[in-house]
């Protein structure tokens, strides 16, 4: 089976956007195969078409903000959006269960993409005696925020797998937060692929930290990650947007072999 995908780099984190059709029953296996084959990649998403309308699909129905940015940037270039012009449209995800308002502006060698997040649920998570972590939930994903020293990094992947069962989420990310530097290191776990991946950056994680900081930060905050900074805007009535630059690479075709 021939498989075509496009690598998209967002703050040095590479998402593979699969543009050829893949049956839903094969997406998890395909994503796992690509992550093993392209070791520089950190996430895999799929584009499906309902007539002329694109839709973002993920391996396990999880929310992928980086995937939304990748598809938005690719569509802008594929549709010839002029340099400096902003294109706004709602992007459907996972069978249309969710729609994310997206805006994209091609500039120089990249596209600046802004995604408006769904409303978050911000609570606490107490997986064991003596440990309580901030928890930010969006439809299809949960983010745990670990202040410096709260969780040992060497044990993080195993803990994340364990906690994901307690949280009953298709994807869970653990964000190692440094308050003084306003920075975090993201570790993402996916139930569909069964893998935990250290990320250079995570757009959804940036939005989650922004939601958590609401009331303690201004209307906008720049959050640093290993791959670079992302801008988060905190609007009224709980609105949150995250903005980052996306670099769309050349399409590649491989023979998919399980």
Specify the residue positions occupied by each region the protein language model found.
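A glycine-rich beta-to-alpha transition motif near the start of alpha/beta enzyme domains, typified by
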Residues: 1-110, 144-258
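Surface-exposed beta-loop interaction hotspot
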Residues: 107-157
């Amino acid at each position: 089976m021939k498989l075509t995908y496009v690598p998209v780099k967002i703050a040095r984190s590479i998402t593979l956007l699969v543009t050829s059709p893949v049956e839903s029953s094969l997406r998890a296996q395909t994503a796992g195969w690509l992550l093993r084959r392209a070791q520089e990649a950190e996430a895999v998403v799929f584009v499906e078409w309902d007539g002329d309308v694109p839709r973002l699909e993920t391996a396990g129905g999880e929310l992928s903000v980086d995937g939304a940015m990748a598809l938005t940037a690719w569509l802008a270039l594929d549709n010839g959006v002029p340099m400096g012009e902003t294109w706004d449209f709602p992007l459907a995800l996972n069978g249309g269960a969710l729609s994310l308002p997206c805006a994209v502006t091609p500039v120089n060698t990249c596209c600046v993409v802004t995604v408006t997040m769904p409303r978050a649920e911000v609570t606490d998570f107490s997986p064991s005696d003596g440990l309580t972590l901030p928890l930010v939930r969006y439809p299809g994903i949960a983010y745990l925020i670990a202040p410096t020293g709260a969780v040992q990094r060497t044990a993080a992947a195993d803990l994340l797998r364990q906690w994901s069962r307690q949280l009953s989420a298709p994807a869970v990310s653990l964000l190692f937060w440094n308050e003084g530097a306003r920075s975090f290191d993201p570790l993402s776990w996916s139930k569909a692929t069964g893998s935990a991946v250290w990320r250079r950056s995570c757009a959804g994680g940036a939005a989650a930290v922004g939601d958590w900081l609401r009331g303690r930060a201004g209307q906008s905050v720049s959050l640093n990650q290993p791959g670079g900074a992302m801008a988060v805007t905190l609007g009224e009535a709980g609105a949150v947007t995250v903005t980052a630059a996306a670099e769309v690479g050349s399409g590649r075709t491989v023979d998919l072999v399980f």
